[in-house]
Amino acid sequence: MLDSMLLVDDESLFHLVFEDACNLLNITLQLMTVDSTDAAEKLCQKWQSGEMKRPDCVFVDLNIVGSSVDGIELVRRINHIYGNGVVIGIISSSSDKKEITKATTAGAQFWIVKSDDIEPRLEKFKSDYPGYKSKTLSFKVYS
């Protein structure tokens, strides 16, 4: 079951779009949002120390202005250092095949193409989530 999510995105307006989409889809959960990879890494350290419960799923923007690393590097770090069972993927307006390949290499399980009309993509993701959690579903692009 999908109870908690972390959205890492530098666009505060998209935080609202994402939250509204979750509400429209009856995804009732704890949603945390941060605007930089640095803030996300601080949360990851809290997961590792047990100070904070890990989210079930992490959505990371590809290009996050003002961050020390890009979204793909954050995906790699979360997967290899802090992840241990967290479903993680990229959410970006880009659908560049080279970037998608880098994301899969870093350990991303999915890629959602960002838009103002994100609900249909999130709805498909929501139905696929159990497959990602059980690691029986392979990488997928939602566009």
Name each region found by the language model.
Residues 3-22:
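Conserved acidic segment of CheY-like receiver
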Residues 19, 33-57, 121:
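Acidic, metal-coordinating helix/loop segments flanking the phosphotransfer/catalytic sites
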Residues 20-25, 102:
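Alpha-helical interaction/dimerization surfaces of two-component signaling modules
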Residues 60-63:
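Active-site residues of response regulator receiver
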Residues 69, 73, 94-112, 116, ...:
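Alpha4 helix (beta4-alpha4-beta5 surface) of REC/receiver domains from two-component response regulators
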Residues 69-84:
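Short amphipathic alpha-helix used as the core "switch/output" element in two-component signaling
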Residues 84-95:
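A short, hydrophobic beta-strand element within the central beta-sheet of small alpha/beta folds
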Residues 120-143:
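CheY-like receiver
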